[in-house]
Amino acid sequence: MMPLILLPAVDVVEGRAVRLVQGKAGSQTEYGSAVDAALGWQRDGAEWIHLVDLDAAFGRGSNHELLAEVVGKLDVQVELSGGIRDDESLAAALATGCARVNVGTAALENPQWCARVIGEHGDQVAVGLDVQIIDGEHRLRGRGWETDGGDLWDVLERLDSEGCSRFVVTDITKDGTLGGPNLDLLAGVADRTDAPVIASGGVSSLDDLRAIATLTHRGVEGAIVGKALYARRFTLPQALAAVRD
């Protein structure tokens, strides 16, 4: 069994690395240069970087040139996310040289387009499933978490049947809160698809990472780690050691 892959997150607003609380615009804490942040995680042993253009995700501009610069300076693989919702933005994202892109809102709002790009690009396209549990129902959220995107299980079944190669699963009540991951949600998604699942949101401790790592045999391949690293709850080398024990 492969050890859990850790993807340190670099969220970019106006060229700077930031962290949001529950993905809300305006809730960010700034951590400095995005290039420096990404190179720092590479230096600390990261094999992947999760790079997010929050300006593009919220529809208020783009950091495309900077993202391409970050990808170009890194030797490790990059998963690129934020505002990828049509052929033009997808082509621009892939042109940075990233290993794969995450499609979010477009998978909910434009299912025909999403099915086509899954078919055309295969392993280079992952789909982000941002989940909010309301009265026991698992609802998907789109457009920076402002809109309802339907029932998680229905959409997962559709995307799985279309051959989606990977799902990035976020419990949005947990993201940026250091509140612990939603293990039941991760296991539930992993059990319903043969595609690998990447966990996102809520990681606050090495024990959280060890808990996610117990799900690798069920199909959870990796975990995105953001605020806990920036808040110095643990170092990346400590985290890598914890999931390889």
From Swiss-Prot:
Major enzyme class: isomerase
Keyword field: Amino-acid biosynthesis, Aromatic amino acid biosynthesis, Cytoplasm, Histidine biosynthesis, Isomerase, Tryptophan biosynthesis
Predominant location: cytoplasm
This protein's record includes keyword Cytoplasm: yes
Signal peptide region: none
Active site residues of this protein: 11 (proton acceptor), 130 (proton donor)
Gene3D superfamilies: Aldolase class I (3.20.20.70)
Subcellular localization(s) per the UniProt record: Cytoplasm
CDD domains reported for this sequence: HisA (cd04732)
InterPro entries reported in the protein's UniProt record: Aldolase_TIM, His_biosynth, HisA/PriA_Actinobacteria, Isoase_HisA-like, Isoase_HisA-like_bact, RibuloseP-bd_barrel
BP-aspect Gene Ontology terms: L-histidine biosynthetic process; L-tryptophan biosynthetic process
GO cellular component: cytoplasm
Highest rank taxon of the organism: Bacteria
Catalytic reaction list: 1-(5-phospho-beta-D-ribosyl)-5-[(5-phospho-beta-D-ribosylamino)methylideneamino]imidazole-4-carboxamide = 5-[(5-phospho-1-deoxy-D-ribulos-1-ylimino)methylamino]-1-(5-phospho-beta-D-ribosyl)imidazole-4-carboxamide; N-(5-phospho-beta-D-ribosyl)anthranilate = 1-(2-carboxyphenylamino)-1-deoxy-D-ribulose 5-phosphate
Protein purpose: Involved in both the histidine and tryptophan biosynthetic pathways.
Family indicated by similarity: Belongs to the HisA/HisF family.
Protein name: Phosphoribosyl isomerase A
Organism of this sequence: Mycobacterium tuberculosis (strain ATCC 25177 / H37Ra)
